[in-house]
């Protein structure tokens, strides 16, 4: 899949988001945040909404963020975004990028119908085509089976430190 024009028998089309989709991508990112944190949409602050819209616009314009939308008859039913990070070569792998998947979100009424798989396949294909070394993500418990079925594995070597505000 190239990331544009991928479709399923269900009539869902995955397409690359354009700059004219920035507001939609930001709104769907807020829905993703509300879903994974079990919030109502109104519980996401205006500051977070505004910062999200600014981030999406700035990052799409710079090329640091790519997003794809899943649509059914023109209506958005899913979103996935990818942050590309330039990385230095190693003796075993000189490819220049790692990808970090964010916002893999599917509308609740379209879950378990293959939309998430279409979005994931699209973002992985983009990584392969553009010389990414790896693609990683943080998974919800519900998302683990999808990612495992696509070949993703947990990495016990990853260590992180959350810094206080």
What are these regions (language model features)?
Residues 13-27:
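A short beta-loop-alpha structural element at the N-terminal edge
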Residues 84-89, 136-142, 148, 153-165:
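Conserved catalytic-core motifs of GNAT/GCN5-like acyltransferases
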Residues 69, 75-84, 100, 105:
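Conserved beta-strand in the GNAT
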Residues 127-139:
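Conserved GNAT acetyl-CoA-binding A-motif
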Residues 110, 114-122:
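Conserved acetyl-CoA pyrophosphate-binding loop and the N-cap/start of the following alpha-helix
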Residues 33-55:
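Conserved GNAT-fold acetyl-CoA-binding loop/helix
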Residues 54-69, 100:
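A short helix-loop-beta-strand connector motif used in the catalytic cores of GNAT acetyltransferases and
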Residues 92-108, 157-160:
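Conserved acetyl-CoA binding element of GNAT-fold acetyltransferases
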